[in-house]
Amino acid sequence: NVLYVKGEVLSGDTLHVLVCHLPSRLGATRVSRRHRMLAVRTVRAVADSVRTATSDARILWMGDFNADVEDRVFREVVFPYFREPGLSPFCADGVKGSYRYRGIWETIDHILVSPVLMDNSRPFHTSDGCRAIVAFPFMCEREKTYGGVRPFRTYQGPLYKGGYSDHFPVTLDFEWRFPE
């Protein structure tokens, strides 16, 4: 699933936003990886179309990629054209990713930007350390089996738990300067 939004930010710059939820890693690894790669190439094609129309397009690509940055999908398709701003060192106690499965933290939710958005000489930009994983106490629950905390999910299988998500949200701060 991909959502494309185009809008104008306060600095007057046009921002193109691509939001995706890539196929799960569950099931046959080779099949799910192939589906994720196909989905990423589809989103990249949309981004390439935007970039063809405007060479210095400000593009933000975000969502649940179901892959970490070491995955082949990032090396081959994403990182040649997008950057992921560095993560803020400030995170809730014990939280080391956006998702936890069987006691292991992973960051599979990403916010990527076109390189022009990392240029701090531009009126509208971001920089390393401006990306954060948000894990307020009300978003967490104690994990009995593996210890520590995990996201407080809405459902666990068919059981309604009353939480909000099985992933912590990822945010990105921007700065902008108005023309003098």
Protein language model features and the residues they cover:
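Structured beta-strand-rich core segments of catalytic domains in phosphoester-bond hydrolases
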Residues: 1-22
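Metal-dependent phosphoester-hydrolase catalytic domains
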Residues: 6, 50-59, 67-180
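A surface/extracellular/periplasmic glyco- and lipid-processing/surface-interacting theme
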Residues: 8, 36, 60
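Beta-strand elements within well-structured catalytic alpha/beta cores of enzymes
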Residues: 17, 60-61
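Active-site metal-binding loops of divalent metal-dependent hydrolases
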Residues: 22, 64-65
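A short secondary-structure junction signal
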Residues: 27-32, 73
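A long, amphipathic alpha-helix that forms part
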Residues: 30-55
